[in-house]
From Swiss-Prot:
Belongs to the SPE39 family. It is found in: Cytoplasm; Cytoplasmic vesicle; Early endosome; Recycling endosome. Signal peptide: none annotated. The modification Phosphoserine is found at S119, S122, S128. Residues 70-101, 121-141 are annotated as: Disordered. This is Spermatogenesis-defective protein 39 homolog. The modification Phosphothreonine is found at T21, T115, T130. One of its GO terms (molecular function) is protein-containing complex binding.
Length: 460
């Protein structure tokens, strides 16, 4: 196609393509201007992670992992180079705090922390020489937020001052057990906080490992023992308690664990036998008084009450015998009498109550004795609706006169009050009590006879 000279000039002047030139400096300057426009058209390279559509290659054609690496300085010392850097300063707030590198090196090498051919200090060296706040270019956050191992443990020391439990929770979640235990061993306040926290959340496994590391044998044993509370099956709980017998408890605690194991073992036997008797309907006590609950996992006193209620007359050789339980678990006389009295009085078995307090001396004489005091006996009998004759018998056995009169008046044991006033020769008190009994009753007649007697020398 033939073109005139004017057409050619118009083509070259209007085309976006530049004519070829042998002037290296002019060509380099045009490259630098193109580079500046390309940089200005991009977003701030600190936020370049969102620009997934951009081709991540360097200007030399080398693929890189970040756009921040793709910014390359060109060789040259023209004024336009300084102008490009000034615009970059405006776009990156941290740029002013970095040392200015010589123009013979690229920014990509700077951010990678290594040099191009030649000598250039690394990124860590450059940052160490900078007194101002430093940044992590990849994250755009101050490096001071990232702490090393020793600084992390300076946080745990604040627990002593500020009681910041969240620090301990964070360390528990992020550190291995060995490191956590070793560091807490020299921080007793933080250690106590962690132990309390583990107990609250029920992390028995970590708590046992901690006590084992600290060589706290008794606390280790107690923590292991507490796990039986989470076992519902009686047989499995019994087997678990058996494993606790040999743990390094104190002598007193070891005896308690042994007793608990023995008690549960007996409860399992008693429960199986009584369930069979109750379902068969052949035993009168179970027909009249059906069981309201299972005996399994009940305390010792409850088990004794159960035995006194359902198995009171059994021989000592059986596991369910109250006497057997008393001897096996060394139950004191006071506790045994109090429990047996409550059980037999509830059944209104007054003969058993009488036999419970009757003792014989070596000459064969009988005497009533109550380790709990007869005033307690009277209160329990009245609570279980004992007849007045039974109440009067035991009120008379109270030794203290004032207590006897108060109990007799409270529970309307008229004969006891009248006889006591007569023995005290207290005419005024007897007259006052006469107004409290029914008119025309036998008690009123008895009081009149005593008041009219000439053989009594009244003190008032």
């Amino acid at each position: 196609m033939n073109r005139t000279k004017g057409d050619e000039e118009e083509y070259w002047n209007s085309s976006k393509f530049k004519a070829f030139t042998f002037d290296d400096e002019d060509d380099e300057l045009s490259q630098l201007k193109e580079s500046k426009r390309a940089v200005n058209s991009l977003r701030d390279f600190v936020d370049d992670d969102d620009d997934d559509d951009l081709e991540r290659v360097s200007w030399t054609g080398e693929p890189v992992g970040s756009i921040s690496w793709s910014i390359k300085e060109t060789a040259g010392s023209s004024g336009s180079t300084s102008e490009g850097r000034e615009q970059m300063k405006g776009r990156n707030s941290f740029y002013t705090q970095l040392p200015k590198p010589p123009s013979t090196y690229s920014l990509s090498s700077f951010f990678r922390g290594r040099t191009r051919p030649g000598s250039f200090q690394s990124l860590s060296d450059a940052l160490s020489d900078t007194p101002a706040k430093t940044y992590s270019p990849e994250l755009g956050r101050p490096k001071g937020e990232y702490r090393d191992y020793s600084n992390d443990w300076s946080l745990s020391d604040t627990v002593r001052r500020l009681r910041q439990g969240k620090v301990l929770i964070f360390l528990k979640r992020t550190l291995s057990k060995e490191i956590l235990f070793r560091e807490l061993e020299v921080r007793q306040v933080a250690l106590r906080h962690l132990i309390h926290f583990l107990k609250e959340i029920g992390d028995q496994k970590l708590l046992l490992d901690l006590f084992r590391f600290l060589d706290r044998t008794e606390e280790l044993a107690l923590s292991h023992y507490r796990e039986h509370l989470n076992i519902q099956d009686p047989e499995k709980r019994k087997e678990f308690l058996k494993t606790c017998i040999g743990l390094p408890f104190s002598a007193e605690d070891s005896a308690h664990v042994q007793d608990q194991y023995t008690l549960l073992e007996r409860q399992i036997i008693i429960e199986a036998n009584d369930r069979h008797l109750e379902s068969s309907g052949q035993t009168e006590i179970f027909r009249k008084h059906p069981r309201k609950a299972s005996i399994l996992n009940m305390p010792l006193v409850t088990t004794l009450f159960y035995a006194c209620f359902y198995h009171y007359t059994e021989s000592e050789g059986t596991f369910s015998s109250p006497v057997n339980l008393k001897k096996t678990f060394k139950i004191p006389d006071r506790q045994y009498v109090l429990t047996a009295l409550a059980a037999r009085a509830k059944l209104r078995a007054w003969n058993d109550v009488d036999a419970l307090f009757t003792t014989k001396n070596w000459l064969g004489y009988t005497k009533k004795r109550a380790p709990i005091g007869f005033h307690r006996v009277v209160e329990i009998l009245h609570k279980n609706s004992a007849p007045v004759q039974i109440l009067q018998e035991y009120v008379n056995l109270v030794e203290d006169v004032d207590t006897k009169l108060n109990l007799a008046t409270k529970f309307k044991c008229h004969d006891v009050v009248i006889d006591t006033c007569r023995d005290l020769k207290d005419r005024q008190q007897l007259l006052a009590y006469r107004s409290k009994v029914d008119k025309g009753s036998a008690e009123e007649e008895k009081i009149d006879v005593i008041l009219s007697s000439s053989q009594i020398r009244w003190k008032n």
